[in-house]
């Protein structure tokens, strides 16, 4: 059964619907003065080739053809929609199609107007509106009947005095408790420096008692991880772009310790990524005082020393808002933002101090940043994120998306896990961690920024039933 994705664009023109087929085999995109003049698709229906109608009108500006290999399929479409000239309704001004094997109809470039994405599985049909131009485009998406990484989302009941509405904060789990630190309600205005603790047995929040070197700044864009019974938090900034250093919090004694002052550790930053294994805490990327960062640093909790990992190379771009997870001894960097969203995937091998870029395939999520992520066995699970920056940067909401995807780090294949229902709403700038609730391991996600620029206060868990 195929899922119909709502057409993106204007509401002018004749409605057309090509229907659902086994696969899309060829795409024709006609260029016009202001954008896309027409589209036409060819489909496979069993052994039969079905040639669809032209939607819009040809011009003398040429037609681009994109042929899909017989063992491949389209997994997402990116485009831009905009009111142009004296039009009263939006038209489609740019389209790019990408397949499961990474083949792209044309490079995806930033354009004026509003970016949109059609994604979530194997695309098996299209629909939309057109006059003498293409006004809107939607798709039909087919999903595998049962994902290899089977699970489901639950909304966790919350009681007590919790973090409330916020985004750009950090969470981590120790035993049967989830901790939350930092964040904002109003853009660029940190809320507090309380350490909130959620008891999974009572489903109740409280504020943890704090002694010792309590972080001196209330901060946003902070990250936090746990190793054993200890929390580690690094960076984050206040409203004047002053930064926090590197701290630990002993959950058995409720004591903060300043491990590395801000001027002595890795480059001060916010909106970076953190991960940990049994002996090391990793800090990657983020936004410094002058520019984004692409370095990876590790802190050995036994030796209490920092190690500056090798440079990932010139082809690896600076970025913030990336996914960072440790899987089977390797440190994985997934996607992020370098001025625009990117979709490259790399891993770092601590044993060899070496970087490797990998090519992933399958039902691949489109470029995004500031998404939720977790490591579950050999998989990296992600949810949501931002697909296009707001013109007002962090002050605005940006274009946010939903969708739960998993990357198998052994086969390098992506799959979509949810099926467009029972899923948290679109969001980004969430706090997330790998966690265990009611005996299941999965992705824990709290809060985040909504497409309306409001903040969420909900707590969700994607629990894995089988791997």
UniProtKB/Swiss-Prot annotation:
Q: A Gene Ontology biological process annotation?
A: seed germination
State the protein's purpose.
Specifier protein responsible for constitutive and herbivore-induced simple nitrile formation, especially in roots. Promotes simple nitriles, but not epithionitrile or thiocyanate formation. Converts allylglucosinolate and benzylglucosinolate (glucotropaeolin) to their corresponding simple nitriles in the presence of myrosinase.
InterPro entries in the record, alphabetically? Jacalin-like_lectin_dom (IPR001229), Jacalin-like_lectin_dom_plant (IPR033734), Jacalin-like_lectin_dom_sf (IPR036404), Kelch-typ_b-propeller (IPR015915), NSP1/2/3 (IPR035429)
Gene deletion effect:
No visible phenotype. Reduced simple nitrile levels in favor of isothiocyanates in tissues corresponding to its main basal expression.
Q: Name one Pfam family in it.
A: Kelch_KLHDC2_KLHL20_DRC7
Lyase listed as a keyword: yes
Task: List, alphabetically, the GO terms of the cellular component aspect.
Answer: chloroplast; cytosol
Something else known: The proton donor differs depending on substrates.
Say which family it is in. Answer: Belongs to the jacalin lectin family.
Q: Where does a (Z)-N-(sulfonatooxy)alkanimidothioate bind?
A: 237, 270, 292, 321, 370, 429
Query: Can you give the residue ranges of the Jacalin-type lectin domain?
Result: 2-143
Which pairs of positions does the record mark as disulfide bonds?
none
Which organism is the protein's source?
A: Arabidopsis thaliana
Designated name of the protein: Thiohydroximate-O-sulfate sulfur/sulfate-lyase (nitrile-forming) NSP3
Lyase as UniProt keyword: yes
Q: Which cofactor does it need?
A: Fe(2+)
Could you tell me which CDD domains the record lists for this protein?
Jacalin
Q: Which GO terms describe its molecular function?
A: carbohydrate binding; lyase activity; metal ion binding
Catalytic activity, per the record? a (Z)-N-(sulfonatooxy)alkanimidothioate = a nitrile + sulfur + sulfate; (Z)-phenyl-N-(sulfonatooxy)methanimidothioate = phenylacetonitrile + sulfur + sulfate; (Z)-N-(sulfonatooxy)prop-2-enimidothioate = but-3-enenitrile + sulfur + sulfate
Which residues participate directly in catalysis? 237, 292
Q: What is its EC number?
A: 4.8.1.5
């Amino acid at each position: 059964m195929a899922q119909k994705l709502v057409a993106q664009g204007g509401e002018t023109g004749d409605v057309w619907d090509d229907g659902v087929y086994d696969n899309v085999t060829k795409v024709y995109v006609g260029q016009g003065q202001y954008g896309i003049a027409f589209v036409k698709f060819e489909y496979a229906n069993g052994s039969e080739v079905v040639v669809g109608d032209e939607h819009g009108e040809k011009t003398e500006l040429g037609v681009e053809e994109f042929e899909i290999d017989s063992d491949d399929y389209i997994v997402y479409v990116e485009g831009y929609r905009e009111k142009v000239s004296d039009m009263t309704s939006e038209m489609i001004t740019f389209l790019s199609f990408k397949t499961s094997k990474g083949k792209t109809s044309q490079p995806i470039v930033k354009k004026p107007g509003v970016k949109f994405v059609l994604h979530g599985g194997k695309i098996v049909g299209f629909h939309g509106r057109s006059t003498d131009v293409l006004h809107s485009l939607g798709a039909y998406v087919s999903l595998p009947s049962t994902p290899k990484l089977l699970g489901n989302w639950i909304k966790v009941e919350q009681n007590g005095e919790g973090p409330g509405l916020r985004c750009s904060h950090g969470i981590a789990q120790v035993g049967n408790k989830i901790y939350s630190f930092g964040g904002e309600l109003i853009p660029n205005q940190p809320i507090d420096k309380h350490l909130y603790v959620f008891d999974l047995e009572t489903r109740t929040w409280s504020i943890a008692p704090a002694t010792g070197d309590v972080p001196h700044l209330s901060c946003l864009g902070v990250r936090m991880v746990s190793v054993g019974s200890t929390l580690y938090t690094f960076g984050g900034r206040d409203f004047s772009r002053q930064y926090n250093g590197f701290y630990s919090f002993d959950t058995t004694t409720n004591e903060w310790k300043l491990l590395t002052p801000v001027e002595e550790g890795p480059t001060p930053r916010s909106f970076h990524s953190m991960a940990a294994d049994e002996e090391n805490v990793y800090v990657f990327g983020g936004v410094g005082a002058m520019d984004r960062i692409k370095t990876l640093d590790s802190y050995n909790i036994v030796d209490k020393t920092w190690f500056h990992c090798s440079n990932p190379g010139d082809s690896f771009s600076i970025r913030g808002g990336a996914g960072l997870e440790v899987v089977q001894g390797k440190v994985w960097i997934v996607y992020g933002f370098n001025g625009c969203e990117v979709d490259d995937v790399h891993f770092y091998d601590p044993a060899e101090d070496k970087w490797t870029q990998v090519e992933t395939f399958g039902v691949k999520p489109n470029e995004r940043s500031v998404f939720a992520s977790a490591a579950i066995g050999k998989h990296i699970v992600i949810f949501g994120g931002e697909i296009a920056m707001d013109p007002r940067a962090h002050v605005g909401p940006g274009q946010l998306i939903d969708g739960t995807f998993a990357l198998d780090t052994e086969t390098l294949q992506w799959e979509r896990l949810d099926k467009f229902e029972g899923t948290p709403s679109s969001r980004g700038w969430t706090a997330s961690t790998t966690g265990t609730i009611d005996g299941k391991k999965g992705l824990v996600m709290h809060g985040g920024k909504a497409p309306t620029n409001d903040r969420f206060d909900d707590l969700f868990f994607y629990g894995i039933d089988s791997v």
